[in-house]
Amino acid sequence: MNPIVVREYEKIGIKGASKTDIDKNKFNKLKEFIKTNKLDEDPKFFEVYKDYIIPQNFIGSINIDNISIEIFPKIPLVKDNENHKKERFLEILEYVETFNENIYENLEIGNENMPILEFFISNFIEEVEKIVKKGLVYSYINKSENILYFKGKLDLPNHIKYNIIENRFFMNFDEFSINSMENCLLKLALEKIKNISSNIENTDKIHKLLIQFEDIETSGLNPVHLFKKILYNKKNEFYKKSLNLAKFFLLDESPYSIFFNDKREVTGVFFPMETIYESYIANKLKQLINKQISIKIQDDS
């Protein structure tokens, strides 16, 4: 089904209340989603009325059951050319840190009507497939275990605590493992989008990829902490684009996007317009003026 496309400040409502109509059941789910996530508060992304809502201050996509509502800027991205508005929208996003690639060039013929959220999921899947084809990176993981043999360094305090009678050794050692931070983050992202995507092709690919990550342990891991520890080098540089996209899905609130999931019935991806245009204009200025001049985007203070 083709997405429903509206611009900022255009009404979305039940039949007869707006130019863009959805059925009453989906409209009520959307209102509940907005209220639950406080999207009608600060920052105010919606004005909510009895029979219609008005999206504002953001661009993005909302999926309700089997339909997708896409919100584009109030100002036209391409003059008198509706067919290329998504392409221009994605071109703007490439100037945002998370999407600092030519993502709009990946908008293949036949995918023009793919919802934005599914498009990002598809891009992430494609990057992970490249990594699997090249080979998952291994790294040394520090472990502390109570084992039957000497390996590494004896952890004497824990050895005394746990092994007064048992014929074991509490050892601290490094193990060359597939449970690298990079692989753990990719698996966490795959597990999350598995519960979000409604595109049959995407979900099929996700399940196939998760088989490749079956031996990777992610229980109890905090993606926020893992991302802070990631350092790129020649060994893992090819993970960078996929991890940027994984961050978009896993951290829910990055500086440039807000992502919500409500029991899979309603999902939304939102890009605050103020932040998007600040980043876009700053990067355009860098291209136009002397590269020796430093340009910084203002912070929230």
Where are the regions a protein language model picked out?
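Acidic-basic catalytic patches of nuclease active cores, encompassing PD-(D/E)XK
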Residues: G16-E41, G268-D300
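Solvent-exposed, charged helical/coil patches
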Residues: F227-K284, I289
